[in-house]
From Swiss-Prot:
It comes from the Bacteria. The gene is ureE. GO terms for cellular component: cytoplasm. It holds the Pfam family UreE_C. Involved in urease metallocenter assembly. Binds nickel. Probably functions as a nickel donor during metallocenter assembly. This is Urease accessory protein UreE. Belongs to the UreE family. One of its GO terms (molecular function) is nickel cation binding. InterPro entries: UreE (IPR012406), UreE_C_dom (IPR007864), UreE_N (IPR004029), UreE_N_sf (IPR036118). GO terms for biological process: protein folding; protein-containing complex assembly; urea metabolic process. The lineage of its organism: Bacteria, Bacillati, Cyanobacteriota, Cyanophyceae, Synechococcales.
Length: 149
């Protein structure tokens, strides 16, 4: 459903309303950091984000709009990633160190590291004592120590 009226997204809602129309907005990990500006929902409805600057959009977030019965649901986009694993915890820690030294975003899961697909990084990883494979998943990188999110 497309509306001709401009929809402005203004804030987060703690609980999903039982009634109302929901627009889905699928965003990459990078796009989920940007809290202001025009976006197209999954059904090509243009919306304007005007959210408070002190946050980050997360998978499943529900956002309120200037239209009382319209809401926006954030969906994390599936992204091309590199999955890194090893039988050796120390090798995985060394790899995390090298990725951090290059300011590469990393998601840390039990026994694996995930980072965005990048041929330079992948070639570097092939020189380490770790297993490297391509995968497609939703990406939730660790927030850095100097993050303002």
């Amino acid at each position: 459903m497309r509306m001709n009226k401009q929809i402005v997204v203004t804030d987060w809602i703690k609980e999903k309303p039982k009634l109302g129309l929901f627009l889905k907005l699928t965003l990459s990990s990078d796009e989920r950091r940007i809290l202001r500006g025009k976006r197209l929902t999954d059904c090509d409805q243009e919306i304007i984000l005007q959210l408070p600057r002190n946050g980050k959009l997360n998978d499943g977030d529900i956002l309120s709009t200037n239209e009382s019965n319209f809401y926006v649901e954030i969906i994390a986009k599936t992204e091309d990633l590199i999955e890194i694993s090893s039988n050796s915890k120390i090798e995985l820690i060394k790899t995390a160190y090298h990725l951090g030294n290059r300011h590469v975003e990393v998601e840390i899961e039990e026994g694996i590291l995930l980072t965005k697909s990048d041929y330079v990084i992948k070639n570097m990883l092939l020189n380490f004592k770790v297993n490297v494979k391509n995968t497609k998943k939703k990406f939730f990188p660790e927030r850095g120590a100097h993050s303002h999110e």
